């Protein structure tokens, strides 16, 4: 079955697309750039939703839903915002057989319509902070699309908060950044760098943008999440003011932040192999698949099925997410490969020998088939729990080791330093930690000559001394340590 998946080394793009389709995560729709998220793919998104939704509520956020149709005039109120998004707008000019007085934009993001509503809801300091999250779909007319990574329509969550002070809004922005980081590392087993974006790379309409950056197996970076400090920009555009405790009218400060179904693409590209998808246990919709190994005799098969059902019952009672594959028409090998395609963390095989020994045979998805072993039914629950926990940790360690091996530090030490930097980025990719003067010109030249962008000014290296350090391109005094990478 794995013969149907392209080699990662030979054709990474096809390997990725093969997994999307063979694991039945998504399929192409009749609309260019739009995908159909299939039930298994959606079950992963549902798991992401349930975990993050709980975390948002724990930090004081409530869910709401705002219209998908946004008056064009709303977007014109914030110049930087419309300039940044207008090339991606999908606009409705006719409806009900008539031309609309004002065109409507299909939601590219919701800042404008939400802040229009906030102007009605926020009047006093008692109304603050206002912390709302929305689970929704978004339309951005992308020219080059790829399932989950970049599509015309995608699913996401977007948080929008209003605060009395700049300090509170910034605190919120960084709080959510940390929520995202912990989620990526603790649940998705993806090591990430977090940090501030350059002015050139920030969100349209933001004062500052912070991002979560991960490294894929092809050594390209993926922006997995963003959190924006919006300052007073949208409050002023929509005249959102509150009366403070002293009776003075003031504009409110804002943040917005979001993640999308792009996370499913990240899961594929960080962990998977040429057998198919590999899912970290904490995010897998199904943690365990039980596969009975049938024989030709019906009487023996009934015993195998009864025993398998007992195994499933034991695991479900212990609150594991478990399924059983009872397909008698398919060979065990086919069903093993099917489970591997789907990335189910643990496979339990039940054959006649297992029944005789009161045992089961167990194998982890991230291990070679030769590492399968038998365990007694008495120790099933405890052993499965240990293996799931171990797999979660091992996947993170493996991804972290890969990132460490592919994060290079290149600083200016002579006239050939930039040429070395350029050659490394072009030939090897990965993250490159270097120094930057903060100049837009240097940033653009590096981007044009290497196709690498500043992913972020990473928090991990903030404490490093910049004394004597110079910009990798122009040799002027360095202001920041930055991460460069080619990206999706």
Swiss-Prot record:
SUPFAM superfamilies, per database record: C-terminal domain of ProRS (SSF64586), Class II aaRS ABD-related (SSF52954), Class II aaRS and biotin synthetases (SSF55681)
Catalyzed chemical reaction(s): tRNA(Pro) + L-proline + ATP = L-prolyl-tRNA(Pro) + AMP + diphosphate
Pfam families with a match to the protein in the record: HGTP_anticodon (PF03129), ProRS-C_1 (PF09180), tRNA-synt_2b (PF00587)
Enzyme class, spelled out: ligase
PROSITE patterns in alphabetical order: AA_TRNA_LIGASE_II
Keyword Cell membrane: no
GO biological process, any: prolyl-tRNA aminoacylation
Compartments, record wording: Cytoplasm
A single GO molecular function term of this UniProt record: proline-tRNA ligase activity
EC number: 6.1.1.15
Keywords: Aminoacyl-tRNA synthetase, ATP-binding, Cytoplasm, Ligase, Nucleotide-binding, Protein biosynthesis
GO cellular component: a single term: cytoplasm
CDD domains registered for this protein in UniProt: ProRS_anticodon_zinc, ProRS_core_arch_euk
Family membership noted in the UniProt record: Belongs to the class-II aminoacyl-tRNA synthetase family. ProS type 3 subfamily.
Domain notes: Consists of three domains: the N-terminal catalytic domain, the anticodon-binding domain and the C-terminal extension.
Subunit structure: Homodimer.
Role: Catalyzes the attachment of proline to tRNA(Pro) in a two-step reaction: proline is first activated by ATP to form Pro-AMP and then transferred to the acceptor end of tRNA(Pro).
Name assigned to this protein: Proline--tRNA ligase
Gene this protein is translated from: proS
